[in-house]
Amino acid sequence: MAAPRRGTQKSDSDSSDEDLDRFREAAWVPPGAHQKVSDEQNEKIALPSLRVRPDCHEHDGNELQTTPEFRSHVAKKLAAILDSSIREVSQNEAVHISKAGNGDSEDEGFRLFRTSLPGEAGIVTSTIPRRKLASSSSEDSEEEQQRCREAAVSACDILRHSTLQQEPQSTPSNVCDNQPPKKKRKKKKKDRGDTSQINSVEETMHIEPGKNELQAKRKKKKKQKLEMAHCDELGNE
């Protein structure tokens, strides 16, 4: 049973070697590739370094090429100047100085605008109006119903308005009665003539009851026309 296993192991190793050989053959490298890589490496090496060289006096912090004795002399002078300008202060003096500094803080600094006030800025309250909270759906529905009721117009309302407009437009006889009489003296004769014509029409209607209804209707129309003309004359006066 062990012999076939050894054979399989050998066959696996042989197949892997063959695969490696095939991959190497397939991986073809162009002839000029190695030369390009070598040229790039040589160029990188040939470029000058940008690091600061400590040997050069231009970059070692001693451009003036001073001696250490001169440096110590300058350091002593600077120390003396600083000692003369600095003094020791106790705690009590520090408190007094801080209070005085707070009083004079308004004069210090600068103002961004002419209208800006000195001192610390107070709390700025926002002037933006807040939005109203959304009401519930029930309240919205009730408000909409009220608006619809106010805007709605029923047929009864329309009929009422139409009747109110028709009432003042009464018959011409009523209009003539409401108007005040003017210049009665001059028109007495005309009134008498009109009344006589109306009376004659009425008499003919009573005297001849046996005639046709058409004649009676015509006479009624004539009577109405005479009344209308009489009212128009009074209105023009």
Curated annotation (Swiss-Prot):
Motif range (Nucleolar localization signal (NLS2)): 217-225
Statement: the UniProt record of this protein carries the keyword Nucleus: yes
Cross-referenced InterPro entries: CUSTOS
Bias-annotated ranges (Basic and acidic residues): 52-62, 203-216, 225-237
Motif (Nucleolar localization signal (NLS1)): 182-190
Family statement: Belongs to the CUSTOS family.
Protein name in the entry: Protein CUSTOS
Organism: Xenopus laevis (African clawed frog)
